[in-house]
């Protein structure tokens, strides 16, 4: 028993390295910005910054909704049907995870050219490519967790497949689907590389941070980073808390 306890302490010590590694930069940037509050106030009143934040929030939200609209049906098919090429389809879904995001931007630009160049469509297209796997995989996992016998009973009692989907499958898988939507939104909010190539304009907050850093240095880019983190983390934590309450 004692050996197992020591092993747990050892694993906790090893794992805590990553926790500290993640938390330390977050705490540090907030602490240093608090010492330069005047710059933060100036940035909060910068119309360009506010517009960039609005662009990021709107496009990320639109991307998450589009990911769910197309990803939920695909997730249901992957969870419920075996078909030739299914493993290939699942592999394709995960491809965006391994492609460098600057390459994603080049691919989209080569494919769609001026149709998405420097536009909201381009921003959403870039975000969608990198975030869709989260929505699809979460939906698939959610439907896999639903007992298929419940669907069969409903079908036996005369319910159509579409009615069974909306009355049984979808409500029971909803927490997982919502989690996927949140992750798709968060991934969209953090995207830079693909957007940089496809749609430098209209500027998102992610691009503006990079631009301010290149042109004006760390002090100018830090408050925008803090604002973007505050907004993103607040929304992310709230949505995760909401999903947790629904699961309870």
Curated annotation (Swiss-Prot):
Main location: membrane
Keywords: Cell membrane, Membrane, Molybdenum, Transmembrane, Transmembrane helix, Transport
Membrane-protein topology: Multi-pass membrane protein
Location of this chain's protein in the cell: Cell membrane
Alphabetized InterPro entries for the sequence: MetI-like, MetI-like_sf, Mo/W_ABC_Transporter_Permease
Stretches that traverse the bilayer: 10-30, 57-77, 92-112, 116-136, 165-185, 224-244
Record protein name field: Molybdate/tungstate transport system permease protein WtpB
Biological classification of the source: Archaea, Methanobacteriati, Methanobacteriota, Thermococci, Thermococcales
Gene expressing this chain: wtpB
